[in-house]
A protein has these predicted regions:
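Short coil/turn segments at the loop-to-beta-strand junctions that recur within blades
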Residues: 94-98, 144-149
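Structural motif
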Residues: 13-15, 76-80, 123-129, 169-178
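Short, conserved, GDST-rich strand-edge loop motifs in beta-rich repeat architectures
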Residues: 1-8, 166-182
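Conserved beta-propeller blade repeats
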Residues: 103-106, 149-153
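N-terminal regions that are enriched for targeting/export leaders
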Residues: 1-51
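Generic beta-strand structural signal
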Residues: 11, 21, 63, 107-109, ...
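Well-ordered mid-protein domain cores that form the structural environment of catalytic cofactors
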Residues: 34-139
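Short, structured patches in soluble enzyme cores that scaffold and shape functional sites
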Residues: 118-121, 130-132, 141-145, 155-160, ...
Length: 182
């Protein structure tokens, strides 16, 4: 995390690392900051990359639908150039994604479909997505939940997606109060 920002790793900036292997040895290494909107704004480069949410894109990197993507727990995933790890920009699945996107999508090995979800601080608290092997979102469903909880991960079976109802509950009013008066 840059100087003057939180030291908590949940809110740190994302950095990706790439290692090329060949002939039994490392051939090259590189790393790049994921140039999310908050990262670019923090560097004073003016308006950040297009996209929604406040994504640090700091948790996972995955390949699906012909794209290398980086994701955090909130906001959109970010597309990365596989050749040099530069940031292409926020990826919203051709406008189908309007809320947050998990850092832990699951790809069904039998179908190649990627299953994902997004959770938020305001209703709807949970949305479930299915993305086809070509990268198009084919299914988006709101799942009714009584409150906003941190749904860090989930599981899939051949027929179901399983979401955990965990005890970490978000209180938006308390968060706003803390922001205004830490």
């Amino acid at each position: 995390s840059r100087a003057g920002t939180s030291g908590h790793w949940f809110v740190g900036d994302g950095m990706v690392h790439g290692l090329v292997l060949g002939n039994g040895a490392a051939q090259s290494y590189r790393n790049r900051w994921v140039r999310t909107e908050p990262y670019v704004a923090g560097l004073g480069f003016g308006k950040g990359a297009p996209g929604g949410g406040n994504s640090q894109s700091n948790v996972s990197v995955f390949w699906h639908g012909g794209k290398l993507l980086s994701s955090g727990e909130v906001g959109f995933p970010y597309e990365l150039n596989i050749a040099d790890l530069s940031t292409v920009g926020a990826w919203d699945y051709a406008g189908a994604l309007t809320g947050s996107f998990t850092a832990h999508p699951k790809t069904d090995p039998a179908t190649g479909r990627m299953h994902a979800f997004g959770y938020g601080f305001t209703a709807p608290f949970l949305e479930y997505y299915i993305i086809e092997p070509d990268g198009t979102m084919s299914h988006r469903e709101t799942i009714a939940t009584p409150r906003s909880t941190m749904i860090h991960d989930f599981q899939i079976t051949e027929t179901d997606a399983i979401f955990w109802d965990l005890p970490v509950v978000f209180d938006l009013d308390l968060a706003i109060q803390y922001i205004n008066d830490p």
